[in-house]
């Protein structure tokens, strides 16, 4: 026994529960052992503080022993050099984790993992405290260390459970202390690791986990949650993409906290009539320069903006204001920081051991092992946690293409084929289907949006039909083609007209979102306005025309912050947007236009009810490359509302008496013109109202004769 006690006191792998705590003696009494390095004296007391037995310091430093003659619970009175502590003995408690939960996690159950792992407030009998639980199957020993035990790796070794799980209940621990796990690897190294399932963390660059508060937040968004019905008539979807740390900053160039963001961002989004905010990843991440796309704390909102409850208050306020919240969520890879998931228990655990499978060369990050059920449970649990605990309305899953292909970013010989010899990552496909299946089953109406840049078939098709089951997919092809077109001098555009029209060949193959995202305004490209050709007048005109064309085009909308008022420069994640630009009338004009585009989208069923259905779209002019003119009809395929005609003239010359075929006779009204003086244009247009002529054109029985302002998009709508 002395050797075992010495090993225990030295922090070596020992079954602590076999040695510490109460153990029956042959005469009916109990022997109690406690490990408390640094303590000066110790006694056993009852619940009222009455001394039951004095503990004797053994010959092994830090180990105290005593004999308890009575039955029932006891507490410890520990005399430290600077205080006296009275607390229950952690090693007097039975297991607190149901084995069935651990078996469910081992089978890939994310809901079970949410309930079991991390720092969970529980009550053992009458005693409140925190149960710490972690998965580390290759470890010889795991201890929890933190502010509550002086970060002494010897003090609180955990109990090993089936499947490589470890748990320990620490009585009377409350919210707020920092903690980590001290993981002893098979080779004897002791690794200090943050909790993979921590619900709260300390502010980077510090890396400890934090015991969270109890779940007492009082939500007030019941009305919003009740209307989240997947069977309802399609609604407008217009997303404002936001990097919370740089949308606006305080006077010291620090990120705003959640209450201040709610106070400033929500009214702004309401003013511009966006339906949703999409946040770049706020899962805790060590490196701010990753924009959140290299996270390690998949269950915790970053501490950069305050507490988890602060984030809940932000979402609640968005919902009360009628704004949905989507989170960019990263399940493709993770960084190799020493405190994180990499080699978590001394061996490849969350990642593949073979770097041909386990490392992203492009990003120098590690790839999750989707073939391991506990890993997929970890990822599924994270997704469900954000949707359930924080009432999120959607997840935009990052870098899906990198998940789907084993040879993504790799040369020949640098990747491992699947079981059938192919390049598809079959385990990742199964995981993505399971992710979408569970979200749809548990949280119907929640969006799942794939950032998928290849032609993988059926990203938004039903799983039963062989698809991946996402509700939406980013249309990267449309974005690349149309931006490339708009960046050309108008005199050259006639030779590249197909870049505008090709997207309509496949526009209804998936449920697409048209993304003008953060990726388009970094790495020296300049802001969206800065990418437009010509002098300042032409740049603004091009931008306005492009945005209106985008809002009329089939597909839901996403616009990154700053584009809505014409930021010139690259986005800089370390500083605020250039809000001073709104002192200029043309920048205010772009902002007014975006608000009007969203208002038009919201009140025009023709623009959103058929946005994913070919029956909601008809060409009028697709082939006028010489004049760089595009014209099409949008209408509600179910017969509601009235049709809308969108016409873009993307040359610098006005066109007069330009004939466009339309499907309905009578009066048509110009409802939006990006060349309006209201938006900073030259104010050339169609005087509000026009009548059709009974002359067939472009496959329609009627035509309109239009004035097309230069570098402009106009909308006309048939009068009822």
From Swiss-Prot:
Catalytic activity of the protein: Transfers a segment of a (1->4)-alpha-D-glucan chain to a primary hydroxy group in a similar glucan chain
GO BP: glycogen biosynthetic process
Lineage: superkingdom: Bacteria
One GO CC term on file: cytosol
Keywords: Carbohydrate metabolism, Glycogen biosynthesis, Glycogen metabolism, Glycosyltransferase, Transferase
Active site per UniProt: 398 (nucleophile), 451 (proton donor)
Listed SMART domains: Aamy (SM00642)
Pathway: Glycan biosynthesis; glycogen biosynthesis
Pfam families named among the record's database cross-references: Alpha-amylase, Alpha-amylase_C, CBM_48, GlgB_N
CDD domains: AmyAc_Glg_BE, E_set_GBE_prok_N
Assigned EC number: 2.4.1.18
Gene Ontology terms for molecular function: 1,4-alpha-glucan branching enzyme activity; cation binding; hydrolase activity, hydrolyzing O-glycosyl compounds
Family matches, as NCBIfam families: branching_enzym (TIGR01515), PRK05402.1 (NF003811), PRK12313.1 (NF008967), PRK12568.1 (NF009221)
HAMAP family registered for this protein in UniProt: GlgB (MF_00685)
Job description of the protein: Catalyzes the formation of the alpha-1,6-glucosidic linkages in glycogen by scission of a 1,4-alpha-linked oligosaccharide from growing alpha-1,4-glucan chains and the subsequent attachment of the oligosaccharide to the alpha-1,6 position.
Membership in a protein family: Belongs to the glycosyl hydrolase 13 family. GlgB subfamily.
PANTHER family linked: 1,4-ALPHA-GLUCAN-BRANCHING ENZYME
Assembly and oligomerization: Monomer.
Protein name: 1,4-alpha-glucan branching enzyme GlgB 2
